[in-house]
Amino acid sequence: GSSGLIPMGRV
């Protein structure tokens, strides 16, 4: 994951 609309896990 990443910093998006829904950050899942790692940012």
Swiss-Prot record:
It holds the Pfam family Periviscerokin. It is found in: Secreted. It comes from the Eukaryota. Keywords: Amidation, Neuropeptide, Secreted. The modification Valine amide is found at residue 11. GO terms for cellular component: extracellular region. One of its GO terms (biological process) is neuropeptide signaling pathway. InterPro entries: Periviscerokinin. Coiled coil: none annotated. Belongs to the periviscerokinin family. Mediates visceral muscle contractile activity (myotropic activity). This is Periviscerokinin-1. It comes from Blattella germanica.
